[in-house]
Amino acid sequence: MKIGIIGAMEEEVTLLRDKIENRQTISLGGCEIYTGQLNGTEVALLKSGIGKVAAALGATLLLEHGKPDVIINTGSAGGLAPTLKVGDIVVSDEARYHDADVTAFGYEYGQLPGCPAGFKADDKLIAAAEACIAELNLNAVRGLIVSGDAFINGSVGLAKIRHNFPQAIAVEMEATAIAHVCHNFNVPFVVVRAISDVADQQSHLSFDEFLAVAAKQSSLMVESLVQKLAHG
């Protein structure tokens, strides 16, 4: 099995990249793909850049050039579920856009024409992630993760997300675009991120302070998940 891993920012990929053996780097379309072995398992790690377009472009390049069997999206996220704290893990069972609106033509809020309203994560990947969470004794929540091209740092944006997606557990800027591409390529995916901030008016301060904590936790989870998928 070859496992694809996608993170948006340098801080979100550096810990994993440094552990890849026999590493080779491909720079393409503003993205970087690192291939090699992570604890003996073939991986292709992508640093995509921030936002939905960068994530979709990167995911497509990774699938075409890295040929992974599954995709894990890692990194940081803003917490929406009330129980989440900085460093906790979120696992997607579904991903949706929070900034897409074609409701004038009868679509659900967040749904794009020709697409499902949400993109379902793979059940086996979810189960493997939850097994890793239990083994590592981490605090985690599974549920809907929503994405959009905005860092949520104020009451208006937060209220809109809570109104349209009251069940959402976390918000970030890439996961749904990656899920969308995986859906089109029929490649299983799961989002496994760590909380860097609680989405509120002070979230930008929390993000700057705790990004390193989130990156460490998400990298720990992904490394464990890669082992679980490769060896059971």
From Swiss-Prot:
Pfam families: PNP_UDP_1
Organism domain of life: Bacteria
Record NCBIfam families: MTA_SAH-Nsdase, PRK05584.1
Keyword Amino-acid biosynthesis: yes
Species of provenance: Shigella boydii serotype 4 (strain Sb227)
Entry keyword annotation includes Hydrolase: yes
Protein name, as recorded: 5'-methylthioadenosine/S-adenosylhomocysteine nucleosidase
GO cellular component terms listed in the entry, alphabetical order: cytosol
Enzyme class, first EC level, given as a word: hydrolase
Annotated residues for binding of substrate: G78, I152, M173, E174
Active site per the UniProt annotation: E12, D197
Catalytic function, reaction form: S-adenosyl-L-homocysteine + H2O = S-(5-deoxy-D-ribos-5-yl)-L-homocysteine + adenine; S-methyl-5'-thioadenosine + H2O = 5-(methylsulfanyl)-D-ribose + adenine; 5'-deoxyadenosine + H2O = 5-deoxy-D-ribose + adenine
Subunit annotation: Homodimer.
Keyword list, A-Z: Amino-acid biosynthesis, Hydrolase, Methionine biosynthesis
Record-level Gene Ontology MF annotations: adenosylhomocysteine nucleosidase activity; methylthioadenosine nucleosidase activity
